[in-house]
């Protein structure tokens, strides 16, 4: 019974900690999936020089190509601090966040997201470690912005492509709403195009129907006038009436436009006055 309880507990732990970014409801929208990052920072701490190295591979299903030899293969995050003084190099601090760590993921309103590892053991201390990603489309690789490392918590702020939403979800491409309209969250651009397309389609069909009805009318009239005659008679009648219609069409259109504009001008000239 005790062994069964241990097996169940182990299964629950492993299912709770697997951070598969490609299938995560938040991280799958960002460029962090399948990436590992190696960041370095040097501080002038007289009389010594302090160098920090941060290895970040928060996605368990991601790459481990940049992992330094000091970090474990199952690390989701690894921090190493060296101090150089009097020509000698000393490893003073090391933090490992293994894939067994619990985590929280939260999107940031200003853009990007945070991954927070909870209850990480660091010697006798239990701390939280936060990876904060922000988007910068001008950068090709992620750059370190701020680091805080003390006995209570660790904070690493980065800026670069990992904090940007993927193509089809990015703010620059679809505002994160997945409709591919960039800075047009209400789909106004597509709406305008749809309206224009509908107007064009409506006019095209109106023109087609007008031509169709005209041809039918000419055929009916030509048939009635040549009823009992030969096909050649019908053809000659149809061609003659069609030619007359085409030649008279400009005059007809001009007359309609003149009458329409004349009516409007007449109405406008009497605007504001009433009959006495």
Curated annotation (Swiss-Prot):
Q: Which PROSITE patterns match?
A: MRH
- Please list which residues make up the signal peptide: 1-18
Which gene is this protein's source?
ATG27
A GO cellular-component term linked to this record: Golgi membrane
What Pfam family is a match for this entry? ATG27
| Protein name as it appears in the record | Autophagy-related protein 27
Superkingdom in the source lineage = Eukaryota
Give residue spans, biased composition: Low complexity.
182-191
- Main localisation: membrane
Described function = Effector of VPS34 phosphatidylinositol 3-phosphate kinase signaling. Regulates the cytoplasm to vacuole transport (Cvt) vesicle formation. Plays a role in ATG protein retrieval from the pre-autophagosomal structure (PAS) and is especially required for autophagy-dependent cycling of ATG9.
